[in-house]
């Protein structure tokens, strides 16, 4: 699983809570980082994505391709939301870390 966000606090907190739940996750800062890791042979079971990453049209195209293959959870802003990405699940800020983790665990369960 990948946690993709430029916000270190979000990445770190979600990863820590997932680790407590027995789920390992890789924290990545950008979609470019995600592409490099996938090109290196690591495939995610699920991607949690900060919606701010979707404002860039090039990043959007890369993520549309990814979202057709793996579940994607977008954490989006209420004030400046990114356009919806087809095939993804969206949560709007403000949202608590435990709510994000609960949604991730539910998505992993339904995907298996």
Where in this protein do the model-derived segments appear?
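Conserved acidic carboxylate
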Residues: 4-6
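Two-component/phosphorelay signaling modules centered on CheY-like receiver
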Residues: 8-26
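Short, charged/polar "capping" segments at the starts of alpha-helices
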Residues: 10-12, 36, 54-57, 80-84
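Acidic, metal-coordinating helix/loop segments flanking the phosphotransfer/catalytic sites
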Residues: 29-46
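Active-site residues of response regulator receiver
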Residues: 48-52
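Short amphipathic alpha-helix used as the core "switch/output" element in two-component signaling
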Residues: 57-69
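Output/docking surface of receiver
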Residues: 75-112
